[in-house]
Amino acid sequence: MWRSVIAGCGSYLPANKVTNANLAERVETTDAWIRERTGILVRHFAAEGEKTSDLAMAAARAALADAGVDAAEVDLIVLATATPDQTFPATATRVQAGLGCRPGAPAFDIQAVCSGFLYALSVADALIKAGQARTALVIGAETFSRILDFTDRTTCVLFGDGAGAVVLRATPSTGDGGERGILSTHLHADGRHHDLLYVDGGPSSTGTVGHLRMQGREVFRHAVTNLYEVVLEALAANGLQADAIDWVVPHQANQRILDGTAKKLGIDPAKVISTIALHANTSAASVPLALCEARRDGRIQPGQLILLEAMGGGFTWGSALVRL
């Protein structure tokens, strides 16, 4: 039996920083209004001509270097994005070619919006456990600045661009309860709520790219409930209590959602990794970005139990319990 171990982690943020004050020059808002409602101070926007694949490749190169793995060893790429370079081919194929990964190995995109990285991680984990891959790149990358409506102050202030990636390595499972790797993943969706968070465009509907639309109050209500339940599901599946978790790495949607979920679970807020202030909501990139930052600054250490969780449009939501 194979187990997927996170061997390396990497991230990338575009150089262009956009502060709340910058946005206040473009839309009717203030720095105080954004801070109080979201916790966001700054976000990064991709430069003109900088594509999702460029962000993804930068994060992937950093992850490969961190893992000490050559790109030629990668035999699977799963890329989570809601903002692909093109309708097709998959952005993952451009990443595969750009990195010099092995031709012929599978590379594909997954679209579950802000839950996308957890969906991608779960799929890659399943393929490794099935013996169909040995070294996988799992990437979350977004250029959400391209689909924002800068006349809608309730949404355009929330999002940023970025990418995060992890390298998964197949490792023989010993059956030891303390071994490293992905211990469990849980995925969910409820399409009845697809019209609460969506983009009002698409090739088969309007023939346009469209802009992001969101009913924020309803999304908040569902997010706290769904994330609470999926965390309990992960704990129950592994026979654990909440105090066994060393760190929670949530999707960075809004500081209020992070705080509300932690309070409902009875988890110490100090155990919750928050990068929302400096990254904003980067959709599928937010979980790996936060994971990599906390690992890089020394908060997350080898052997610790890490709970990843996210919810996105659809609705989609999920969790992954990992021992690093």
Curated annotation (Swiss-Prot):
Gene3D superfamilies linked: 3.40.47.10
Protein localization: Cytoplasm
Enzyme class label: transferase
Active site annotation, chain numbering: C114, H251, N281
Entry GO MF terms: 3-oxoacyl-[acyl-carrier-protein] synthase activity; beta-ketoacyl-acyl-carrier-protein synthase III activity
Reactions mediated catalytically: malonyl-[ACP] + acetyl-CoA + H(+) = 3-oxobutanoyl-[ACP] + CO2 + CoA
Chain residue ranges for the region called ACP-binding: 252-256
Pathway: Lipid metabolism; fatty acid biosynthesis
Keywords attached to this entry: Acyltransferase, Cytoplasm, Fatty acid biosynthesis, Fatty acid metabolism, Lipid biosynthesis, Lipid metabolism, Multifunctional enzyme, Transferase
Signal peptide: none
GO cellular component, as recorded: cytoplasm
Pfam families xref list: ACP_syn_III (PF08545), ACP_syn_III_C (PF08541)
InterPro entries assigned: ACP_syn_III_C, ACP_syn_III_N, FabH, Thiolase-like
Known EC number: 2.3.1.180
CDD domains listed in its UniProt record: KAS_III (cd00830)
Domain of life per record: Bacteria
GO biological process terms held by the UniProt record: fatty acid biosynthetic process
Domain notes: The last Arg residue of the ACP-binding site is essential for the weak association between ACP/AcpP and FabH.
Family under the similarity heading: Belongs to the thiolase-like superfamily. FabH family.
PANTHER family: 3-OXOACYL-[ACYL-CARRIER-PROTEIN] SYNTHASE, BETA-KETOACYL-[ACYL-CARRIER-PROTEIN] SYNTHASE III, CHLOROPLASTIC
NCBIfam families: fabH (TIGR00747), PRK09352.1 (NF006829)
Subunit annotation: Homodimer.
Role this protein plays: Catalyzes the condensation reaction of fatty acid synthesis by the addition to an acyl acceptor of two carbons from malonyl-ACP. Catalyzes the first condensation reaction which initiates fatty acid synthesis and may therefore play a role in governing the total rate of fatty acid production. Possesses both acetoacetyl-ACP synthase and acetyl transacylase activities. Its substrate specificity determines the biosynthesis of branched-chain and/or straight-chain of fatty acids.
UniProt name for this protein: Beta-ketoacyl-[acyl-carrier-protein] synthase III
Organism: Rhodospirillum rubrum (strain ATCC 11170 / ATH 1.1.1 / DSM 467 / LMG 4362 / NCIMB 8255 / S1)
Gene: fabH
